[in-house]
Structure formats: C-alpha cells, structure tokens
Amino acid sequence: MQQVFFQETEFLNSVIDYNHKIEAENLCLDIAYGTDKNFLFGCGISIASILKYNEGNQLCFHIFTDYFGDDDRKYFDALARQYKTRIKIYLINGDRLRSLPCTKNWTHAIYFRFVIADYFFNKAPKVLYLDADIICQGTIEPLINYTFSEHTVAMVVTEGQKDWWAKRAHSLGVAGIANGYFNSGFY
C-alpha cells in the first residue's frame, strides 16, 4: 500500500473549475503544473501551446498554485472557453513547503510536484507533469496513447558532456548534479 504524505485536507484550500468541454466524457489526458504567481502567465502560454497543436484530443489541465488573482481567473477562464477544454486550479496552502530548502532559482513551488503526485494517486491512470516554461511545438498523441505498466514513472534525462555538467553544478551551486540528473520539469 502506498503512503500519501501530502493529505488533501492539509494542503488543498479550494478548487476552481473552468470546465468548457463540449463532450461530457471524463476520459482525458490529465496534464498538471505546479507554479507560483511568477509563472502563472507562462503556465497559460504552455497550456495554449499544447491546445494549439492538439485540437480534438481530450485534455484536462490541473494547475497547483498558492496564488490566483482576479486577472488570472479571467485569463484561464477565457483560455478554457476558447479551446473548449477544462482547466482546474487547485489553491494550495504552501506554508509548510516554505520551510523546506529553497534557493533563489528554486522556490518552494518546486515542492508542488510532490503534492500533485499524492493528489492524483489512485485518481488518474496517467498524469503528465510539466513545468510552466515548457512550450509544445507539435502533437503529444504519442504521450496520450502511451500505456505505462503499473507504478511507472517516465522522465526526460538531460544529456551533456561531463564538463557541461560540471559548469552547471558550479553555476547553480549544487555540486550533486555534476554527474547529471533528470529533468523534473517533464515527467
């Protein structure tokens, strides 16, 4: 039995559902984002790029954030309406996450992906997690149609030469990535 660390009752304050899907069918590829207010606009651009290249596919978007203002409400509602899709906003309490280690490059929002994993456990057969700075330039049908074996995670492994990794580790001040890492912004 899988243990869930982030209980909904502790982290989830409210859900806003912009459901403008034409079909009532619930089957869709769930695509999730975890972002703070600094990347909400970029998140919208990422969603729009996916929708632009994947018309006709059943997609549902889930944004986990600790801030969602009036302008954001109008923008994401209009986006869902324009593309006849569903965008759900999960307002989370990030207070406990703010106590975890962060840097100037990685805010407490990097931990939202763990909340997302626990939230969808036993709720969705497959979830595509993307960082808000991901832009889609084509179809994602191979991801939509891909069938995973049970309890499988797929991720993008960033490639590079050893000296490139050493420079990245130095520039980010994180010695542990000198031997490489996987890109946690796409899994």
Regions found by a protein language model. Give the residues of each.
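Glycosyltransferase catalytic domains, chiefly GT-A lineage
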Residues: 1-187
